[in-house]
Amino acid sequence: MDLAALRDQQRQRAAEVVTQDDFDIMPPRFIGGADVGFEQGGEVTRAALVVLEYPSLQLIEHQVARIATAMPYIPGFLSFREMPALETAWCQLAQRPDLLLVDGHGIAHPRRLGVASHFGLLVDVPTIGVAKKRLCGQFTPPDAAPGSCQPLMDKDRQLGWVLRSKARCNPLFISPGHRVSQATALDWVQKCLLGYRLPEPTRWADAVASRRPASDPLLRG
């Protein structure tokens, strides 16, 4: 596997990422969530996409795609591993979202092309990265109160936000994916929080991708 070529591709695509607001519909009528899991010891990639109506944040659709895993896990190149299954699930959606929250990083990536940015470019939709762990950048820990946040920085450039979404929980790392500004990325993640650590779109996508039981009848069967 030619990692040097993949790095070059990441840098080239990162230059195409738009970090200003460019929404087709504002406020969005439908907000999506995306997450990826793996089966059979990593041999099968399972991508989940959910669509919620806004402002009710009610789940209206979910799709799951399972395909053979394209490449092994290599830190910094996760999008190449996850994107084929995500694209397959995206093509199955009857209702495409106006905004997509992705479990993973946007521009808060060593080469500024996390899966949220990479996938946003692929399908040309506004995306936001919502990650559970830091990949790069420095920050001051946010206060303990829910809603507290601090910028995630790389020297003098802001990569995203570190958000305390729930008390007594580790913070989330929020960053623009594509066609979304820093301020708007933080704003929409906060609007999608309903008392859990994860915002509703990625919370539902995580449940579907992880195959955990869910109370909503739409997920049964």
Swiss-Prot record:
Signal peptide start-end: none
Top-rank lineage group of the source organism: Bacteria
Enzyme class: hydrolase
Membrane-spanning ranges: none
Site (Interaction with target DNA): 73
Main localisation: cytoplasm
Keyword DNA damage set for record: yes
Compartments reported by the entry: Cytoplasm
Residue positions binding Mg(2+): 35, 103
UniProt cofactor(s): Mg(2+)
GO cellular component terms given for this protein: cytoplasm
GO molecular function: deoxyribonuclease V activity; magnesium ion binding; RNA endonuclease activity, producing 5'-phosphomonoesters; single-stranded RNA binding
GO BP term, pick one: DNA repair
Entries under InterPro entries matching the protein: Endonuclease-V
Gene3D superfamilies linked to this entry: archaeoglobus fulgidus dsm 4304 superfamily
Keywords, in A-Z order: Cytoplasm, DNA damage, DNA repair, Endonuclease, Hydrolase, Magnesium, Metal-binding, Nuclease
EC number annotated for this UniProt entry: 3.1.21.7
NCBIfam families (alphabetical): PRK11617.1 (NF008629)
Biological function: DNA repair enzyme involved in the repair of deaminated bases. Selectively cleaves double-stranded DNA at the second phosphodiester bond 3' to a deoxyinosine leaving behind the intact lesion on the nicked DNA.
Entry's family note: Belongs to the endonuclease V family.
Name of the protein this chain belongs to: Endonuclease V
Lineage: Bacteria, Pseudomonadati, Pseudomonadota, Gammaproteobacteria, Enterobacterales
